[in-house]
Amino acid sequence: MKAKDLRQKSVQELKELLAKLREELRVLNTLYINKRPFNYGRRRQIKRDIARILTVLRERNEA
């Protein structure tokens, strides 16, 4: 997900997407802790997407 696309979304949409990604990350982290097979690349991408969303939300709060 690109930051440019995120900037076009409303704050409510960003918060909903953030909650969804955090839940997905929680599930992947559980698999990681239990040494189950999962997609490492997806885990990394989710963490980056969460960081991008938080960055966009902070930009809007400062503006």
UniProtKB/Swiss-Prot annotation:
Belongs to the universal ribosomal protein uL29 family. HAMAP family: Ribosomal_uL29. One of its GO terms (molecular function) is structural constituent of ribosome. This is Large ribosomal subunit protein uL29. SUPFAM superfamilies: Ribosomal protein L29 (L29p). It holds the Pfam family Ribosomal_L29. Keywords: Ribonucleoprotein, Ribosomal protein. Gene3D superfamilies: 1.10.287.310. GO terms for cellular component: ribonucleoprotein complex; ribosome. It comes from Nanoarchaeum equitans (strain Kin4-M). One of its GO terms (biological process) is translation. It comes from the Archaea.
